[in-house]
From Swiss-Prot:
GO terms for biological process: immune response-activating signaling pathway. Keywords: Cell membrane, Disulfide bond, Glycoprotein, Immunity, Immunoglobulin domain, Membrane, Receptor, Signal, Transmembrane, Transmembrane helix. It comes from Homo sapiens. PANTHER family: CMRF35-LIKE MOLECULE 5, POLYMERIC-IMMUNOGLOBULIN RECEPTOR. It comes from the Eukaryota. This is CMRF35-like molecule 5. N-glycosylated. Residues 1-18 form the signal peptide. GO terms for cellular component: plasma membrane. Residues 19-165 are extracellular. Expression seems restricted to cells of myeloid lineage. Glycans are attached at N28. Belongs to the CD300 family. It is found in: Cell membrane.
Length: 194
């Protein structure tokens, strides 16, 4: 059976645009200070939701803050997030840092199918200074200020079975595909001759 490209787009949502997300591997902050991390994403994902979550396990991390699809800043408790869609960078700021904020965090982009994300290890030092991880564009490479290690994490993808979008699309598309298959089989059934 031949499937049209438009049908393949229905079957494989979120796979039609190549995407990648990058950010610093480690960032240091000081107790009672603030910490800013910038994560970059590929073209085509400007209006998708961006998020920051906490926890070493990608599939079970706790989402702290999420954008609303615009460039408007969203703040929840001590964490804020702002998406610069023109530059394909979103910025997450944590304020009034505590020692127990030291943990693994993830910058992520919510999309149909599989979310994209990159792990950022945060360490908190005693003291009261502000740490900033900043992107500088220089000849297609990314550089960070001294507050962050000068390398990027490799992106990970979230399991599609953990994504509510995937489950919703699966439950929506499955009956459609089954009815299409039934129609094709019914049209191509052998005809009885009298």
């Amino acid at each position: 059976m031949w499937l049209s490209p438009s049908l393949l787009l229905l079957i494989l949502p979120g796979y039609s645009i190549a995407a990648k997300i990058t950010g610093p591997t480690t960032v240091n902050g000081s107790e009672q200070g603030s910490l800013t991390v910038q994560c970059a994403y590929g073209s085509g994902w400007e209006t998708y939701l961006k998020w920051r979550c906490q926890g070493a396990d990608w599939n079970y991390c706790n989402i702290l803050v999420k954008t609303n699809g615009s460039e408007q800043e969203v703040k929840k408790n001590r964490v804020s997030i702002r998406d610069n869609q023109k530059n394909h960078v979103f910025t997450v700021t944590m304020e009034n840092l505590k020692r127990d904020d030291a943990d693994s965090y993830w910058c992520g982009t919510e999309r149909p199918g599989i979310d994209l994300g990159v792990k950022v290890q945060v360490t908190i030092n005693p003291g009261t200074q502000t740490a900033v991880s900043e992107w500088t564009t220089t000849t297609a490479s990314l550089a960070f200020t001294a507050a962050a290690t000068q390398k990027t994490s490799s992106p990970l993808t979230r399991s599609p079975l953990k994504s509510t979008h995937f489950l919703f699309l699966f439950l929506l598309e499955l009956p459609l595909l089954l009815s299409m298959l039934g129609t094709v089989l019914w049209v191509n059934r052998p005809q009885r001759r009298s």
